[in-house]
Amino acid sequence: FMDAVRAFDEDVLMYEQSQGDIKFLESICDYYKREYSIEYKPTDIVVTMGASEALTMTFTTIIDPGDEILIAEPFYSNYQTFALVRGGSICPIPTSSKEGYRYASRDRLEAALTDKTKVIVCINPGNPTGLALTAEEMDIIADFVIENDLWLIADEAYREYVYDGIKPRSFANIDKLKKNLIVIDSVSKRFSACGARIGFVASKNEEFMTGIIKLAQSRLCVSTLEQIGSTELFKLPSSYYEEMNEEYCKRRDTAYEEIMQIPDVICHKPGGAFYMMVDLPIDDAEDFLMFLLTEYRDNNETVMFAPAAGFYSTLGNGKSEIRIAYVLESSYIKRACQLICTGLEAYKAK
């Protein structure tokens, strides 16, 4: 990324095309064809300022006031804001920590459906749950979408982060979804380049893409240099993803083994992303966190995590749960999880 940016030697740093730099668009298309045998054309893609802008544009294009958005709970909390800005509302599909947060059954999907449902959002693999959908579950969702003439927003920013023999798969691999599918992606997680703020939206629905391009034109363009750098990232070989997965799998296993030392804890080993949800034997995870930050030290060290209640739209849900992001080296992850364990003992004894 940085080598490509440093190699830029034009005299003038010009505006890029609103849809995106053509070389970058072509590199994205080549990546999908090489890694997933998916045929995208540059006209099927619009480059955005991170996946967040891709989602904002998508909701602006397809959501009308009063529309309902189905999404499995817990979910990435910014979706609540994206929906509210357009006058839509989140309708959570309930899940359970004991069931590993799985939601893709016909009964569960149909129970959440109403005459106001416009779209279902699938974050796959999931944030904050780390849930990786099986191929069968993806097909169930696809059939549900087509039968009810819904939009499917597939947030696939963590797509390559899958473990235990799971093969990375995109909803774009399901041909019958062609006109119903909107894929959201970014360089942030896949290439550890969050600060580049490069994302994109991809769809074969021409009417939808026309609306997205109009929105892209209204904000001129995405940073030229970041697109130049990102072009090279999408040329990385498959071995890059294999090495990345091997390392994150080790980190996940380290976190899981340490967390499972806690008596009465509920934790399912996640199949993807780099997040792990933990249901602790306490009433209030946020209160526990404040204890760790303000009162607890072990060798002058403590730990911080994300209380999971913020990932729920249903008031009162997730109060005993936390989200761990296993993005540090394994030795740090091991120590952090040990601090949760020992801190929990001190918290319950106070």
Residue ranges of model-derived segments:
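Active-site PLP attachment segment
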Residues: 167, 173-211, 224
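A short helix->loop->beta-strand "cap" motif at the edges of active sites that frequently abuts
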Residues: 67, 88, 147-151, 177-179
